Amino acid sequence: MNGDETKKVESEYIKKHHRHELVESQCSSTLVKHIKAPLHLVWSIVRRFDEPQKYKPFISRCVVQGKKLEVGSVREVDLKSGLPATKSTEVLEILDDNEHILGIRIVGGDHRLKNYSSTISLHSETIDGKTGTLAIESFVVDVPEGNTKEETCFFVEALIQCNLNSLADVTERLQAESMEKKI
């Protein structure tokens, strides 16, 4: 696919899976990452609502309430030092193993991300002739008092971009290790 075709495919997935209803005091954005690892491998990491620290570098610990991972599950996340927060309480809103979509909503914590929700969807694609994954993550959040929409979006986009880059690093490394074992 050329650049225009890729943008068209991305746009279709965004329209289908990443629509957020915004009010005036909120901001929203969508980020895209092309990952050189197959969809099943990337999804096996992303779908683990109970282990986000496997690829999210700012999370040090996660405890899920209850034993079953399902829509409505709640997790308590401890954040690494250096961030303007130490903990977050999050609810699993979407877990679709067929469409490869995970959605969360933040319901508590000592941070300023009020009414935050995000959706990540994964889609199979071909990268350099090999099976890869298109990861799309979108969010909506209230703009905290004293901040602008631009500042808020910039901050959240930076966090998500770090998470997506880490997801690519982790899954591409796992894919390379898997290929080495086959040789």
Swiss-Prot record:
MF terms in GO: abscisic acid binding; protein homodimerization activity; protein phosphatase inhibitor activity; signaling receptor activity
Record InterPro entries: Plant_def-hormone_signal, Polyketide_cyclase/dehydratase, START-like_dom_sf
Alphabetized UniProt keyword annotations: Abscisic acid signaling pathway, Cell membrane, Cytoplasm, Disulfide bond, Membrane, Nucleus, Protein phosphatase inhibitor, Receptor
Positions occupied by motif Latch loop: 111-113
Subcellular location: Cytoplasm; Nucleus; Cell membrane
Location of region: START-like: 20-172
Sites marked Involved in ABA binding: 57, 104, 156, 159
Signal peptide (from-to): none
Chain sites annotated for binding abscisate: 56, 85-90, 112-118, 137
Task performed by this protein: Receptor for abscisic acid (ABA) required for ABA-mediated responses such as stomatal closure and germination inhibition. Inhibits the activity of group-A protein phosphatases type 2C (PP2Cs) in an ABA-independent manner but more efficiently when activated by ABA. Can be activated by both (-)-ABA and (+)-ABA.
Protein name, entry field: Abscisic acid receptor PYL10
Lineage, opening ranks: Eukaryota, Viridiplantae, Streptophyta, Embryophyta, Tracheophyta
